[in-house]
Amino acid sequence: MPGFVVGLLSDTHIPRRLRRMPPAVLEALDGVDLILHAGDVDDPAALEPLRALAPVYAVRGNIHIQDFSDGGAALPAVVTLQIAGHRVLLTHGHHPGVLGFFLKGLDVFAQCVRLTDKGQTNWRIARRLAPLYPEADVIVFGHSHWPHVERIGRQLLVNPGAVCATSSEQPTVARLCLSEGVSEVDIIPLTQPQVSNQTPTFCNSTQR
């Protein structure tokens, strides 16, 4: 895809769940012009390998309310950029504060008892963010650990999925191509083993 290429990723949870950035992430994002991380880093130092590829912008996620972030709480909640004629907004997608932490717990419980799924979570987040940021042409979010691409009116909403996936999830990143009047997304599965603190292949925590 021609144009300005943005690498997208979210929910890496390094070093609490993954020890370091998986090589598959660096391979998938090699050659991009810019990288956006949509929250739950957890330690901003984990972004350094990405900076060797391209400039990086990152936002904080819901995990930072628990003081597990090793400085991640200092990251901004929202970043807005003008890229190739598109206004791109980056945020984690969670409700802020203690309410967001409580709602996330309810959502995880509902998924465990099969009252809802991550696709529905993305659907709800997209419909909350689109009217909240009407000036944005592209909204990039994370939080659900599940990829999502949807257009609501003129807006493109993208969740690249999670790098730190649970045993039931496929880890993914994304590449967003922007040119004048055009925005396209490729979701990229990560097939190589992750370097996890808990299992040989995937993170094994149900908490997001």
Predicted segment positions?
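Binuclear metal-dependent phosphoesterase catalytic core
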Residues: P2-G3, L9, T80-A84, R151, ...
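Conserved catalytic scaffold of divalent metal-dependent phosphoesterases
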Residues: V6-R20, E27-A28, V41-V140, S144-L156
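Short amphipathic alpha-helical segment that frequently serves as the phosphate-/nucleotide-binding helix
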Residues: M21-P23, V173
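Juxtamembrane helix-loop transition sites at the ends of transmembrane segments
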Residues: V32, G61, A110-V113, C164, ...
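Conserved acidic residues
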Residues: D33-I35, D137
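Active-site rim/loop-helix segments in enzyme catalytic domains that contact anionic ligands
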Residues: I35-V41
